[in-house]
């Protein structure tokens, strides 16, 4: 039976929900005369639904009929799910109609491998040409590059889309070979390198010719699945740092694995997604991008998993407590960034303001410094530091100020650095949820205090 456009949209939008590499673009070019849509930053407001989908972009697959059989993917060819495929004209018209009704401000376009990577990419290119050339759509377009696509097609796509992305999916070649035998390291990193080189060449051309065509002006991103394979947090973070440095990625996205198939190579269907681990990876990724940390400083060979109770920055500060306190009126900018409670914006404010006069606690508070945490790591005018004192009482006081309160609503059973009774396990034994959270929190405080 022939599917209606709404049936296709329902199937293909649902099939795209597991791809998280979709956020605010960072692109900023205003609308041009005779076009519709704008990539101007204030107009790109991205809202997210409860399951993480971005609702201001039309986030959809062109097809979920896949020739690949990646075991972690809901759209793999061996899975019995409803299938659908848009024609290029259908998808282009749907995007324009949604835009005209103010439902969306752009398009996130991906696809399962319909036949071959090149055939799939050619169909995606047809959609982009219709939007850009026939409908004169000037809004934001993020296009997913299919591993194995020929360089010529990737080059064409880069001049039509604002951002490209090639998903790494799994953090090691061994896991790719085991869980996604149709993909390989070369088919992923070759297009990633091509996009990086073409983007740099485009930027150089623009310095010489202001009307030179732009290649993926919003850069490229990628996504890794966390928890489907045995790689450690340390391994994942090392890979992310390498991709940032080698390919100039704008963003690495991390997706906690949601079991979608009963496969002995994957976690069981009743396994909970490692959301806390995903959260810690995003926090560590932020340190790499904005706080001048190196991956080896956050995790190392001896500690390859994140602390479940402290965010990565606080954990580093606790492990290097001998470097503190620092005088905010004299400390280098790089050291200010490492103080818990001081972010890049407040660090810049401190650096600029201290040139005029010495700063005290009142000035720091107005600059956005979170003194609840920072007070144990700084000195300033009129303040010699909130020394926790010697003994267990002092260590507990600083621990309570630094500990992440959000972890206790989910439990920390996914990480084995400490071994407190997990919240969920206590609740299953009949302990009230709030009481279970308090018990786990107190145990965590004791563990961290001993570590200090």
Segments the model singles out, each with a brief description of its role:
Residues 1-65, 370, 378, 386-452:
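Flexible, acidic/Gly-rich N-terminal and inter-domain linker regions that tether
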Residues 222, 233-255, 260-266, 275-276, ...:
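A conserved active-site cap/scaffold subdomain adjacent to cofactor or substrate pockets
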């Amino acid at each position: 039976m022939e599917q209606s456009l709404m049936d296709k949209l329902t199937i293909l939008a649902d099939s795209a929900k597991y791809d998280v590499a979709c956020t605010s673009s960072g692109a900023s070019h205003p609308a041009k005369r005779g076009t519709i849509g704008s990539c101007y930053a204030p107009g790109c407001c991205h809202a997210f639904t409860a399951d993480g989908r971005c609702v201001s972009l039309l986030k959809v697959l062109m097809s979920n009929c896949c020739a690949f059989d990646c075991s972690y993917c809901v759209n793999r060819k061996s899975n019995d799910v409803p299938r659908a495929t848009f024609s290029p004209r259908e998808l282009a018209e749907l995007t324009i109609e949604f835009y005209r009704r103010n439902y969306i401000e752009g398009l996130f376009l991906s696809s399962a491998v319909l036949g071959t990577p090149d055939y799939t990419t050619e169909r995606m290119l047809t959609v982009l040409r219709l939007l850009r050339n026939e409908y004169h759509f000037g809004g934001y377009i993020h296009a997913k590059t299919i591993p194995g696509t020929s360089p010529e097609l990737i080059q064409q796509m880069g001049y039509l889309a604002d951002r490209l992305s090639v998903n790494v999916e799994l953090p090691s070649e061994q896991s790719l070979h085991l869980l996604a035998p149709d993909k390989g390291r070369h088919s992923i990193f070759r297009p990633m390198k091509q996009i990086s080189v073409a983007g740099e060449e485009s930027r150089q051309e623009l310095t010489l010719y202001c009307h030179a065509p732009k290649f993926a002006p919003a850069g490229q991103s990628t996504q890794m699945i966390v928890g489907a394979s045995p790689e450690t947090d340390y391994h994942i973070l090392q890979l992310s740092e390498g991709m940032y440095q080698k390919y100039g990625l704008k963003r690495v996205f991390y997706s906690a694995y949601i079991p979608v198939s009963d496969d002995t190579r994957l976690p069981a269907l009743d396994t909970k997604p490692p959301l806390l681990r995903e959260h810690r990876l995003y926090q560590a990724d932020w340190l790499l991008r904005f706080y001048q940390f190196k991956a080896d400083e956050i995790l190392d060979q001896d500690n390859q998993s994140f602390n479940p109770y402290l965010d990565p920055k606080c954990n580093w500060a606790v492990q290097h407590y001998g470097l503190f306190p620092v005088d905010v009126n004299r400390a280098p900018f790089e050291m200010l960034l490492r103080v818990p409670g001081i972010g890049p914006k407040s660090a810049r404010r401190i650096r600029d303001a201290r040139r005029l006069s010495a700063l005290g606690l009142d000035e720091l508070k107005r600059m956005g410094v979170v003194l609840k945490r920072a007070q144990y790591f700084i000195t300033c005018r009129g303040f010699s530091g909130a020394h926790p004192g010697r003994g267990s009482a002092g260590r507990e006081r600083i621990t309570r100020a630094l500990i992440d309160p959000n972890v206790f609503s989910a439990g920390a059973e996914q990480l084995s650095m400490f071994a407190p009774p997990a919240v969920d396990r206590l609740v299953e034994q009949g302990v009230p949820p709030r009481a279970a959270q308090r018990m786990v929190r107190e145990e965590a405080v004791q563990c961290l205090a001993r570590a200090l």
